[in-house]
Amino acid sequence: MAPSHVDKVNTRTWSASIVFMVLTFVNVSVHLVLSNFPHLGYPCVYYHVVDFERLNMSAYNVMHLHTPMLFLDSVQLVCYAVFMQLVFLAVTIYYLVCWIKISMRKDKGMSLNQSTRDISYMGDSLTAFLFILSMDTFQLFTLTMSFRLPSMIAFMAAVHFFCLTIFNVSMVTQYRSYKRSLFFFSRLHPKLKGTVQFRTLIVNLVEVALGFNTTVVAMALCYGFGNNFFVRTGHMVLAVFVVYAIISIIYFLLIEAVFFQYVKVQFGYHLGAFFGLCGLIYPIVQYDTFLSNEYRTGISWSFGMLFFIWAMFTTCRAVRYFRGRGSGSVKYQALATASGEEVAVLSHHDSLESRRLREEEDDDDDEDFEDA
């Protein structure tokens, strides 16, 4: 079947979005490379934010001065930036593969607006725009770290985390219910069936980045708060654990309540959350200033509680995943229900359309008779 006008418009818009995505990726890559050289317009290197040698857990914040707080050290920030860039590269390659398979294929499919259906399921223009926002906000986040502005670091970390979250949700749900998602999957072009596994890998990779960004945004928020309010550094270190626990629990619950229906294999956030916990441990173990005071007991208990929460939700996800694999009939039953409902709706729509056409023909016959 020849592509319709809707398919042509949607394909061109989607292609333009992918072109902008590639340009944004190149821009962010060049920015990260150049930001390692302070004499090229950047005041400082982005990966050296906090001087842990000057950190004092018992000291209060001094207004108009930079107060060191718990944050990622230089090695962690470089690894974080490189990993995020690899995630961006993988997502960009995924979109390019989808674009080649949809735009360059000779068999356009037998369904009306087949390309539009495929683009909507694999990642439409809005999802591509959200990914571009995620890359842009990450670039601004590293730029604020280069200027060492605590308030802006906290703000851009939160904005980047929000954009990455919305992009992940759009990749998982495609803005539709579970039954509608199953129906669109059943109408997917046969040549894209294998790419769905690539899409599952991309979803989990983005969730790994999201899990580690939970640690980053918790540190950044407390880092900004601690440099703008008269609080102790030790209290802000403990606040990092509280913020991390709240955000991670919300995401764990969303995965178990909603997202697991769309993508069965979802261990990416759990893996990223584990790496985030390790990212919290490293600077605390590396620098004795964290443990040589009265906050040692509170920090130890906080670590224990966070690892317990992580282990509990990870075990729950593993049990539900393997139990779901054992009962394969549920998936096909839901697919049949979704298809039946969709066919019933389409049949009702066709009957109404046929009735409307018959009425118009009768009216035309009456007018011809009157003219005669």
From Swiss-Prot:
Gene: gM
Function of the protein: Envelope glycoprotein important for virion assembly and egress. Plays a role in the correct incorporation of gH-gL into virion membrane. Directs the glycoprotein N (gN) to the host trans-Golgi network.
Keyword list, A-Z: Disulfide bond, Glycoprotein, Host endosome, Host Golgi apparatus, Host membrane, Host nucleus, Membrane, Transmembrane, Transmembrane helix, Viral envelope protein, Virion
Keyword Lipid metabolism: no
Residue ranges with Basic and acidic residues bias: 348-359
Protein name stated in the entry: Envelope glycoprotein M
Record's subcellular location: Virion membrane; Host Golgi apparatus, Host trans-Golgi network; Host endosome membrane; Host nucleus inner membrane
Domain of life: Viruses
Presence of keyword Repeat: no
Subunit text: Interacts (via N-terminus) with gN (via N-terminus). The gM-gN heterodimer forms the gCII complex. Interacts with host RAB11FIP4.
Record-stated family: Belongs to the herpesviridae glycoprotein M family.
Transmembrane segments: 14-34, 80-100, 127-147, 152-172, 201-221, 240-260, 265-285, 299-319
Main subcellular location of this protein, as a coarse class: virion
Residue ranges that the UniProt entry lists as topological domain Intravirion: 1-13, 101-126, 173-200, 261-264, 320-372
GO CC annotation: host cell endosome membrane; host cell Golgi apparatus; host cell nuclear inner membrane; membrane; viral envelope; virion membrane
Skewed-composition ranges (Acidic residues): 360-372
Stretches assigned to the Virion surface side: 35-79, 148-151, 222-239, 286-298
Originating organism: Human cytomegalovirus (strain AD169)
